[in-house]
Each structure stands twice: as structure tokens, then as C-alpha cells.
A protein has these predicted regions:
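Helix-loop-helix hairpins and the membrane-proximal interhelical loops
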Residues: 24-70, 88-91
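Transmembrane alpha-helical segments and their short flanking loops
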Residues: 35, 46-57, 119-177
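C-terminal ends of transmembrane helices
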Residues: 6-19, 114-120
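Juxtamembrane transmembrane-helix boundary motif
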Residues: 7, 11, 31, 43, ...
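Membrane-interfacial helix-loop connectors
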Residues: 1, 6, 72-109, 118-120, ...
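Transmembrane helix-bundle signature of multi-pass membrane transporters/permeases
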Residues: 1, 26-29, 33, 69-75, ...
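Generic alpha-helical transmembrane segments of integral inner-membrane proteins
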Residues: 4-8, 25, 62, 66, ...
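Membrane-water interface of transmembrane alpha-helices in multipass transporters/channels
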Residues: 18-23, 59, 93-101, 163-168
Length: 178
């Protein structure tokens, strides 16, 4: 319904301001439609023995960081990866206690596209991408140490401030670590 409203506003309205609002509405509609499709597709993941075994084996924080990094590097969007993590936690495919580590990997993985883009750029572009990478790696390393020492109190706090809602807790962890 949101997509249809956005399309109608973009296609049939003559005022530029209304068209821009229609584009925003259309964008949100497509975003929510994509999240719904991803949520529905997680049902197939639930039945895949290989995926269940892989996700069950994600108890090692280092493996979780590498997984978050790899998915984000491929998708080139930490927000999309966090959305996938959020859906997987909501569907009980992934333990909530491993999510903060995956999100640390997402933060580091988000630097890949900037590093690749800087390869053909000038010296300042390369420096900016390197500083972005170093900032995220150092920040993630500090947070990693904190999580190793206090993962249970951290996840309990996130669940408490999120009203026990796992999906909201994942979003709050991502917000906190950004």
C-alpha cells in the first residue's frame, strides 16, 4: 500500500515538492517490502540443516566478527547486515549473545567499500578511508574487550532497555556501537 501511494505521487503529481515526498514514501515502502520478503525467506533458512549447523556453531566471538565482516563486505551495507541479523534473532536462528560480536564485524566491514573507492582516488581520499578503517577497528577492539569481560550484563542491559524485545535489542546494540 505504501509503495502504491508513493508511485501514484511520483507519477501523477505535477508539483516537484509532492513528487519528492512521493519518492520518500516510495523508498520507505520498498524498504519495508524488502524486509518483509527477507523475513518470509528466513523460513527456508530455518529448514536448511547446513545453515542451522553453521549458525549453531557461531559461539566463538572471533567467528561472529568475521561472519559480520564478510556479510557486510559483500552487501556493502552494515544496516542491511544488521537487518538480516535482526530477522535471524527474531526467528530464533541466532543467539542474541553472539549478535554484538557480529555487529562489531559489520562496523569493520562497512569500511570495505570506502577503501575500495579510495583506491582510485587522491591521497586525501586514501587517508580518509584509512582513518575510517582505523577508527572502526580500534573502536571495535575496545568494545570487543568490554564484551568479552561482560557479555551477559551487556545483553541483559540491552534486553532490559528494549523491553525484552529481541529485535529492538539488536537495533539498540547497533545504535550503541555506531
Amino acid at each position: 500500500l505504501i509503495v502504491i501511494i508513493g508511485v501514484v505521487m511520483v507519477m501523477f503529481c505535477k508539483k516537484q515538492g509532492i513528487k519528492k515526498i512521493g519518492e520518500v514514501i516510495l523508498g520507505f515502502g520498498i524498504l519495508f517490502m524488502g524486509l518483509s520478503i527477507m523475513g518470509d525467506s528466513m523460513e527456508a533458512v530455518k529448514e536448511s540443516p547446513q545453515m542451522i549447523e553453521f549458525l549453531a556453531s557461531l559461539t566463538n566471538p572471533f567467528a561472529a566478527i568475521l561472519t559480520g565482516f564478510a556479510i557486510t563486505a559483500v552487501l556493502q551495507s552494515s544496516s542491511a547486515t544488521v537487518g538480516i541479523i535482526l530477522l535471524m534473532v527474531s526467528q530464533n536462528l541466532l543467539e542474541f549473545t553472539i549478535c554484538p560480536f557480529m555487529i562489531l564485524g559489520c562496523n569493520i566491514g562497512s569500511c570495505v567499500s570506502a577503501r575500495v573507492a579510495s583506491l582510485s582516488g587522491k591521497k586525501d581520499a586514501k587517508r580518509a578511508a584509512l582513518i575510517h578503517l582505523l577508527f572502526n577497528v580500534i573502536g571495535s577492539a575496545v568494545m570487543f574487550l568490554i564484551l568479552l569481560l561482560a557479555i551477559d550484563p551487556f545483553t541483559d542491559m540491552m534486553l532490559y532497555i528494549s523491553g525484552g524485545n529481541l529485535a529492538r535489542s539488536v537495533a539498540n546494540v547497533h545504535t550503541l556501537m555506531k
